[in-house]
Amino acid sequence: MNAAVIDSHSAQDYVVADIALAGWGRKELNIAETEMPGLVQIRDEYKAQQPLKGARIAGSLHMTIQTGVLIETLKALGADVRWASCNIFSTQDHAAAAIVEAGTPVFAFKGESLDEYWEFSHRIFEWPNGEFANMILDDGGDATLLLILGSKAEKDRSVIARPTNEEEVALFKSIERHLEIDGSWYSKRLAHIKGVTEETTTGVHRLYQMEKDGRLPFPAFNVNDSVTKSKFDNLYGCRESLVDGIKRATDVMIAGKIAVVAGYGDVGKGCAQSLRGLGATVWVTEIDPICALQAAMEGYRVVTMEYAADKADIFVTATGNYHVINHDHMKAMRHNAIVCNIGHFDSEIDVASTRQYQWENIKPQVDHIIFPDGKRVILLAEGRLVNLGCATGHPSFVMSNSFTNQTLAQIELFTRGGEYANKVYVLPKHLDEKVARLHLARIGAQLSELSDDQAAYIGVSKAGPFKPDHYRY
C-alpha cells in the first residue's frame, strides 16, 4: 500500500490504511465492550490506582477490534502504548484507525509486505522524546525476538547473514538497515525492558527455549497457559472462527466433506468440533499418542497425512510445527482441495515449494495453486492464520478471557517485576479463577458456594483456589 509506505516516513506517528475508517471502528469497539466484561471490570477495579502509570508498552498482537478494547484498557490503567500487528493479514483497518484517532500510535494495515511488517515491529520501540519501551506485550514472540536477535547482531553480524526463508530475508535486512543507522539500536532498547507477557503457544515455546539455554534477558509471563486462555481462546475461539474463515473465503458446503485436522491440542480440538458440527467427516493426524487416543475416543478417525492427502477435501493445520503439509502432500491432493492453517506461523504448510507453479488470485487471501497437470489447490491466507486472514478472528467474549489475563500479567510484571528472575512464569491460580468469575454473570451462570464443612472436607478455602496447580481441566 503506497500511502502506508509514505506515511511510515512522514511526521505522522502512525501507519494505517485509512484514518477515515475511525468512526466505523469506534462503533464496533463500543459493541465489543459489551461482550468483554473482564476487561471492563478490570478497568473499573484498577483505574483509580493507575497501576500501569509509567509503563511504556510495545505491543505486537493482531490489531483487531478486540485488541482495541485491550489497548484502551491498558491506557485507562495508566500505560502509554505503541502497537503493531503480529501478522501481515490480521489487522482490521477500521480498528486500527479508531485506536489512532483516540491517540495511540498504531503501525498496521491488512495486507502488509514482510518488509513493512518488520519496519512496523521496529516502530513500536521508537518512543518519542528519547524515551524507551519498558514492557513488551507479544503474540508469537516476534517483538521479543527482534530485540534479542538485533542485540546479538550488534556483536556478530553472522547471525543475520544466512536467511533460510523469505521471512528471515525481510527480518535480517531490516536489522541490518537499523544497525547501519545506529550500531547499538537494539541493546539500548533491550536494556530498558522489564519483562514480556506472551499470548500464544508458539511464542511461549520460544521463551521456554531461551530460558533453557540461559538466554532469556528478562522475566516473562506465559499468558497462553492460563486455563482461562488456553482452554477457552484456543478451544472455543477456534471452534467458531475457523469455519468462519473457511466459509467467508470459499462459500463451500462443509457438510458431507472429509476434513483433516493436523494436531489435536486445544486448537485442534476446537477445529475438529466445529467441522463435525457442520456435518463434515473429520480425520485427525497426530504424533502424540495421548492426543491421538483422545481424538479416537471422541470418534474421530486418526490417520496419517500421507493416507489422507488424496482422499480429503479440507485440510487444516493446527500444530505449531514445520511443514506438516509438504509439497508431496499437496501434489497428491484432489482437485480444489482447500488447504489452510490456524497455527501462528505460516511454516506449517510448505507454501514456498509451490511458488514454482502458477498462482491465480481469486480474491484477497484466496489463491489457486495450479499444478502442471491442471489440478488446482485452494490455499487460504497464503498459509497464515485463516481465521484472521479470511475472517475477523475469535469472538469478543472469549478474547475478553485472554486479554484480561494479559492485563493482569502486565500489572504483575510492571509493579513487581523486580521480584522475578529471568524465567517464564504462569499467573497464579487465584487470578485464573478471578478471570473466570468476571465472565460468569454475562452469560447468566450462577456459581455455587461451599459450606464451611464442605470446604474443610476437601481442604480448600471457600474463596478458592479450588484446584491444585497440576490439575488438568
UniProtKB/Swiss-Prot annotation:
Reactions mediated catalytically: S-adenosyl-L-homocysteine + H2O = L-homocysteine + adenosine
Record InterPro entries: Adenosylhomocyst_ase-like_sf, Adenosylhomocysteinase-like, Ado_hCys_hydrolase_NAD-bd, NAD(P)-bd_dom_sf, S-Ado-L-homoCys_hydrolase_CS
Top-level lineage group: Bacteria
Subcellular localization(s) per the UniProt record: Cytoplasm
Keywords from the UniProt entry: Cytoplasm, Hydrolase, NAD, One-carbon metabolism
GO biological process, one term: L-homocysteine biosynthetic process
Pfam families referenced in this protein's UniProt entry, alphabetically: AdoHcyase, AdoHcyase_NAD
Cofactor(s) needed: NAD(+)
Binding annotation for substrate: T64, D139, E199, K229, D233
Pathway annotation: Amino-acid biosynthesis; L-homocysteine biosynthesis; L-homocysteine from S-adenosyl-L-homocysteine: step 1/1
Gene3D superfamilies registered for this protein in UniProt: Adenosylhomocysteinase-like, NAD(P)-binding Rossmann-like Domain
One GO cellular component term noted in the UniProt record for this chain: cytosol
UniProt function note: May play a key role in the regulation of the intracellular concentration of adenosylhomocysteine.
NCBIfam families (alphabetical): ahcY (TIGR00936), PRK05476.2-3 (NF004005)
Family as reported in the entry's similarity comment: Belongs to the adenosylhomocysteinase family.
UniProt name for this protein: Adenosylhomocysteinase
Source organism per UniProt: Burkholderia pseudomallei (strain 1710b)
Gene transcribed to yield this protein: ahcY
